[in-house]
Amino acid sequence: MEGVMGQVEKRPISTIVFIVAMQKEAQPLINRLRLVEEVNTPFPKEVTWIMFKGMYKDLNINIVCPGKDSTLGVESVGTVPASLVTYASILAIQPDLIINAGTAGGFKAKGACISDVYVVSTVAFHDRRIPVPVLDIYGVGMRNTFPTPNLIKELNLKVGRLSTGDSMDMSPHDEESITANDATVKDMEGAAVAYVADIFKVPTILIKGVTDIVDGNRPTSEEFLENLAAVTAKLDESLTKVIDFISGKCLSDL
């Protein structure tokens, strides 16, 4: 198995799938790369998932978003939609690399500022509390992301740990778990994407832009909405540099 994985890591990267929770977060990159919405997606007809695709340099780029909830019409954020689209995308597209990109809250106590863009080193859940031996470890689900030392050095990107939960706010229980996870940023999808990708052994990178300061003095939702447009633009710049760096390289070069 190690020999097969070694061969894969030395083969040029060809197909990338971006998993992005909200189309608003993905739109600047969609526009920049001139990606086209796929009308006949490889997904079940019942789902609201949206797929954009196109060629950029030598890369087959696919951006998949969970789309809007069919009942309420709001963006389908959170771990469940993220897990589903990741699973379906791996089966249908068979990517060489998954990039989960999006916005996140940051912690000023860990040095995070609005518009900072982080490459995630380790990801875990903070709201799956199972106080039973071994199941407690399973609940946290801590995983390392695919190592990208050359990319981080070349692009001078910040690195931090990510904690994932299904709430935008932070309860005292969540805060305790996030502290235990030593997280610099928190989101609502990353650990779920990493969990599914790990099952299929698909290398995964998580890149997050900070829209709000969780341990600041302003309401998270207010700060998120205020900074969303500016931070997605900054995220787009970073993602474009990441794609340019990946182009023509193998996984082992990252």
UniProtKB/Swiss-Prot annotation:
Catalytic residues as annotated in Swiss-Prot or TrEMBL: E25, D212
N-acetylmethionine, modified sites: M1
Binding locations of adenine: K186, D212
GO BP: any one term: L-methionine salvage from methylthioadenosine
SUPFAM superfamilies associated with the record: Purine and uridine phosphorylases (SSF53167)
Keywords from the UniProt entry: Acetylation, Amino-acid biosynthesis, Hydrolase, Methionine biosynthesis
UniProt-recorded name of the protein: 5'-methylthioadenosine/S-adenosylhomocysteine nucleosidase
Family: Belongs to the PNP/UDP phosphorylase family. MtnN subfamily.
Subunit structure: Homodimer.
Covalent S-S links between cysteines: none
Function: Enzyme of the methionine cycle that catalyzes the irreversible cleavage of the glycosidic bond in 5'-methylthioadenosine (MTA) and S-adenosylhomocysteine (SAH/AdoHcy) to a lesser extent, to adenine and the corresponding thioribose, 5'-methylthioribose and S-ribosylhomocysteine, respectively. Contributes to the maintenance of AdoMet homeostasis and is required to sustain high rates of ethylene synthesis.
Organism of provenance: Arabidopsis thaliana
Coiled-coil boundaries: none
Substrates-to-products reaction catalysed: S-methyl-5'-thioadenosine + H2O = 5-(methylsulfanyl)-D-ribose + adenine; S-adenosyl-L-homocysteine + H2O = S-(5-deoxy-D-ribos-5-yl)-L-homocysteine + adenine; 5'-deoxyadenosine + H2O = 5-deoxy-D-ribose + adenine
InterPro entries the UniProt entry points to: MTAN (IPR044580), Nucleoside_phosphorylase_d (IPR000845), Nucleoside_phosphorylase_sf (IPR035994)
GO molecular function: adenosylhomocysteine nucleosidase activity; methylthioadenosine nucleosidase activity
Biological pathway: Amino-acid biosynthesis; L-methionine biosynthesis via salvage pathway; S-methyl-5-thio-alpha-D-ribose 1-phosphate from S-methyl-5'-thioadenosine (hydrolase route): step 1/2
Deleted gene: phenotype: No visible phenotype.
EC number: 3.2.2.9
Residues reported in the UniProt entry to bind S-methyl-5'-thioadenosine: T103, K186, D187, M188, E189
Key word Hydrolase present: yes
